[in-house]
Swiss-Prot record:
Similarity comment: Belongs to the chloramphenicol acetyltransferase family.
The name this protein goes by in its record: Chloramphenicol acetyltransferase
Species whose genome carries this gene: Streptomyces acrimycini
Lineage top rank: taxon: Bacteria
A GO molecular-function annotation: chloramphenicol O-acetyltransferase activity
InterPro entries reported for this sequence: CAT-like_dom_sf (IPR023213), Chloramphenicol_AcTrfase_AS (IPR018372), Cmp_AcTrfase (IPR001707)
């Protein structure tokens, strides 16, 4: 699958409020952080039970929707090594091959309409459900971010240690197994963030917006 690769827009460093923060966490104290939250998916799961659409792709689309709202989660480094922002980013997501106990990484172009996205992504999942290559479509585009799923376990913490990953500004999401508590259905979600790209405020806003989106799943 091919998609036009846009040109990221450079950030005006003279007016960027986070210039000093970016420099600090990119050069002086390079670091990432992980935030794990429980998202209430009670209404979301109930709506999916009445829908033929796939819950995993609905989760992926919801993540892509809130990610694309905010420049800090569409950041990259341009060819000069300066911070820039993609006009749109696409989700790359895993599919598990139970026979080999390995997974493949797929990607689908983001569309603000869930139905359009699902119609593109669902056949990809079906086609590559037994994939033996890590990237059966070839490498994802540079304006992609990663989503993986661990539907076998519910967790309260998850961290990725990325050696020398200081150029990776895109967020990384990990989804877990639903758990029920006090009649509510909860989804564990871990978000791995480069601190140069976003602070705790930005990540909290992202997860809160995801909660709001899943609490009113009329878009399904």
């Amino acid at each position: 699958m091919d998609a036009p690769i846009p040109t990221p827009a450079p950030i005006d460093l003279d007016t960027w409020p986070r210039r000093q923060h970016f420099d600090h966490y990119r050069r002086r104290v390079p670091c990432t952080y992980a935030m794990t939250v429980e998202v209430d998916v009670t209404a979301f799961a109930a709506a999916l039970r009445r829908s033929p659409r796939k819950s995993y792709l609905a989760q992926v689309w919801a993540l892509a929707t809130v990610v694309n709202r905010h420049e800090e989660f569409r950041m990259c480094l341009n060819s000069s090594g300066d911070p820039a922002v993609w006009p749109v980013v696409h989700p790359a997501f895993t599919v598990f091959n139970p026979e080999r106990e390995t997974f493949a990484c797929l990607w689908a172009p983001y569309d603000p309409d869930f139905g359009t996205f699902h119609d593109t992504a669902a056949p990809l999942l079906a086609e590559h459900s037994r994939a033996t290559d890590f990237f059966p479509q070839g490498n994802p585009p540079p304006n992609a971010f990663d989503v993986s799923s661990l539907p076998w376990v519910s967790f309260t913490g998850f961290t990725l240690d990325i050696r020398d990953g200081w150029d990776h500004l895109a967020p990384i999401f990990t989804l877990g197994r639903y758990t029920e508590r006090d009649t509510r259905l909860l989804l564990p979600l871990s978000v791995q963030i480069h601190h140069a790209a976003a602070d705790g405020f930005h990540t909290a806003r992202l997860t809160n917006e995801l909660q709001t989106l899943l609490a009113d799943p009329a878009w399904l």
